């Protein structure tokens, strides 16, 4: 388990560095990220490289038992580069050229920029690639820029030509006869700005993804050619940010990382947990938090400080969801620059700020020997998966039909009730292998590719339960409407035995009577509603609309399709339900699929999550299961401790568990203080 911070030694005289490193060591830190914005210090003028200062910083850290994550500095090109080569600066959609002096203001597709990126990364890799004090590399920082230059337009046209081969195919897939958009020359195709042809917009998103992947792959290849095999490579992504397809980019990385900031307010674990799950799902591996806030940020409407103890909960919350590393941003704020008031561990006077005390407590816990040993080689392993697709998000966000329709909010609507019930979820690519899951949910999977159709049908035919929500199966892989009603693809419609007869953007909530638990439950649907039609005599309605707009009255709002011979089936939910109805639907799905909660009792605001050793049979000798219990509230809570049978799913008598954070055995009830954490393992 790694714990640390981002440090910028280039901001400070070398005479200060030893004091900083001593404070890191005292805080329990065993890793530090450096270098990712220091290009002008590494290469003050073209081709003149200065790494002695970096060598000194690395040695200071190493001598104090602190490993180094080395960042490539390519998010912040030096002024001499952008001045002499203005073509390296990105062109915004407005036609304005990005200014030097910010970050990520470069054009990632610029051949000139790529040349200089290769040079600096190669110099770093040759110098530090065989250095065992460096455990890994972070490439760049928070990819985000989209370039709209004429050069990018030409490369986009070439990309489309490679993909579609002929203009006839492109025109057909994009329905360009509409509004006389038909192209007779590849050079006629524009970069979409604002609303445009759905096929063109999706194609440009795919192109942007490829640009970033090429940019990243250049750095990956240079480092791998010069680095030790054990030096890993990652990038720090930004949660739900969607300018490119993260699944594509992470294929070339060893694992994914992300930067987690709360901003205004306080953390809601039911919302943040699924972003951890999203990041873990990029590679289906544990992840790192390369940045998280040490108290507050500086860019939110109200940059309030986290409550005392809240950061500890957040740290263990991340670990529970698969984080193997956690670093604060930043160690100390520079006297100048754009982020002067951002939270930090060290103040302007060089002394620890109040947050340093809590960070030290967190560090002592995360890096304690018994904790590290217990968490080693463990990861979250779940029975429920939620599917996620950038293509679907792009498709819906370009044509929401109701501006209140947010595909990420729909995903969270389905994930939150599981978090409240101590049931973890995996968030997977829509084309992922689904073997081993009891329940798959596809929230607003509007665009379904042939590969996804094959995966989903195989899953149901193999006995799985698949939930398709509103807007599933509207479009094909080119962002064109399927020539059939939802769920679109014939294979899915045949399995479902249900189709969407019509969809409605709602201006007012409509009544929905839910019957899935055997008794009517009065609820509502809002934003979006679909009128379902049962195609199979074996399909059954699970909910009906009440009197509303006349079009929905009395029609099915949810339905379960016929069971396949394997026992699998598809369930269609045609409404965005109110919270109480969503909760009751979740309970019904759990009962239908036999999903087992990580902890049988639940208390509002208390999270229970587990990490396990993959491949170990529950309860078998050598199996390792670590349970994280977090009180996210400011009140004392009590949580009954279950018997061993609740941990393994089998029979068993009352059992004893050890809290690794206190060294004490847990009694029959966990007494949780405000913002308290328990790390439980089975006692000998």
Give residue ranges: language-model regions.
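Short, acidic/polar
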Residues: 12-25, 117-123, 238-249, 307-315
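Aromatic-lined substrate-binding rim segments of carbohydrate-active enzymes
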Residues: 19-25, 33-95, 219-227, 446
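Conserved, mostly hydrophobic/aromatic
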Residues: 5, 24, 32, 61, ...
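The substrate-binding groove and active-site-proximal loops of carbohydrate-active enzymes
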Residues: 3-13, 37-52, 99-118, 140-147, ...
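Short, solvent-exposed turn/loop segments enriched in Gly/Ser/Thr/Pro and often Arg
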Residues: 8-10, 35-38, 71-80, 135-144, ...
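Polysaccharide-binding and catalytic clefts of secreted carbohydrate-active enzymes
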Residues: 94-255, 259-272
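Carbohydrate-binding surfaces of carbohydrate-active enzymes
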Residues: 186-189, 229, 239, 250, ...
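Short, well-ordered coil/turn segments that N-cap beta-strands
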Residues: 1, 28-30, 62-68, 130-135, ...
